[in-house]
């Protein structure tokens, strides 16, 4: 029987209706120099100057954004399937003007603890938690802990068509439990419709090492701001409040496979939507002016 290689099966759920796409691979050869298998990502995005507003009298203008991501997971095999053990770090830095009623930094440092298993030749399952600290700074970590988790699966209709189903749970979210669905469809030898959130896209494979794509990236996460954030910004309801940050990026890019273990990605596009939502305090700043962005990343499996 052909063995499914779960390390290539990527299924992450980060926000409402945001379910990442699975990939499928043949059985890989053993690595004689590094006995463990795994995956990694190093990514940097710059978003140009944009605007948000709460109402016509309250707005934040002309601020840029840096989004930095590091991700490293090892995938040792055990009898039930493949463990996923690792860590992630993401930092969103905003070039806000002095006195802005928004945090200038949002960051998450979390573990990745999960299991990939295969119920049958056609059904693949992932359970994964991301326990860690999600906040606007590391001043007080004791009550900034959160542990969102996902349960998802893929049904393989054929080598060219897969259905992705799952549910995300995050107690800090406005709607704690959210389901999602998506498909991956290889429409032609060089064309793939990867209609699975958070990165739905249409791909064109130029050759084995080069892929062009156009699509979107939908990001959402929940953070705790500082204990005195509300006092400093004139609204005590925002002290240690939960902030849901959302943004949508649309663009086009290129995946260039430099080696079997390294893929370089470059992407440019436009950010049409961004929102800072203190939903429990009923304070929301939404997009009032989009911005261009550019992304570069190195990623791979080993």
Stretches with model-predicted labels:
Residues 181-184, 190, 254-260, 286-302:
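Outer-membrane beta-barrel "beta-signal"
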Residues 50-52, 59, 92-98, 198-272, ...:
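Outer-membrane beta-barrel translocator/channel fold
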Residues 26-122, 130-139, 146, 242-244, ...:
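Transmembrane beta-barrel domains of bacterial outer-membrane proteins
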Residues 74-78, 117-123, 155-159, 171, ...:
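Outer-membrane beta-barrel strand-turn architecture
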Residues 78-84, 121-127, 160-165, 190-193, ...:
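Repeated loop/turn-to-beta-strand initiation elements of outer-membrane beta-barrel proteins
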Residues 44-50, 78, 87-95, 131-137, ...:
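Transmembrane beta-strands of outer-membrane beta-barrel pores
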Residues 64-72, 107-113, 129-133, 147-151, ...:
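Hydrophobic, lipid-facing positions within transmembrane beta-strands of outer-membrane proteins
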Residues 59-63, 103-105, 137-143, 168-177, ...:
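Solvent-exposed loop/turn segments connecting transmembrane beta-strands
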């Amino acid at each position: 029987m052909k063995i499914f290689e779960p390390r290539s099966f990527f299924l992450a759920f980060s926000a409402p209706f945001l379910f990442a796409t699975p990939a499928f691979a043949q059985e890989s050869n053993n690595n004689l120099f590094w006995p463990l298998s795994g995956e990694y990502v190093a990514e940097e995005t710059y978003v140009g100057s944009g605007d948000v507003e709460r109402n016509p009298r309250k707005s934040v203008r002309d601020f840029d954004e840096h989004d930095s991501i590091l991700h490293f997971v090892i995938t040792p095999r055990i009898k039930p399937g493949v463990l996923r053990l690792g860590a992630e770090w993401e930092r969103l830095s905003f070039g806000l003007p002095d006195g802005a009623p928004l945090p200038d930094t949002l960051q998450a440092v979390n573990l990745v603890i999960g299991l990939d298993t295969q119920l049958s030749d056609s059904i693949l399952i992932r359970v994964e938690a991301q326990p860690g600290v999600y906040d606007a700074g590391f001043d007080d970590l004791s009550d900034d802990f959160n542990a969102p988790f996902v349960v998802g699966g893929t049904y393989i209709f054929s080598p060219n068509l897969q259905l992705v189903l799952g549910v995300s749970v995050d107690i800090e979210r406005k709607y704690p439990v959210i389901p999602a669905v998506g498909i991956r469809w290889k429409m032609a030898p060089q064309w793939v419709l990867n209609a699975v959130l958070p990165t739905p896209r249409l791909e064109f494979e130029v050759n084995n090492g080069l892929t062009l794509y156009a699509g979107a990236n939908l990001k959402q996460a929940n953070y705790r701001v500082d204990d005195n954030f509300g006092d400093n910004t004139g609204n005590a309801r925002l002290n240690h409040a939960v902030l849901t940050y959302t943004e949508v990026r649309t663009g086009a890019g290129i995946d260039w496979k430099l080696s079997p273990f390294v893929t370089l990605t470059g992407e440019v596009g436009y950010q049409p939507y961004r929102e800072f939502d203190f939903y429990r305090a009923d304070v929301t700043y939404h997009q009032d002016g989009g911005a261009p962005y550019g992304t570069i990343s190195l990623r791979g499996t080993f």
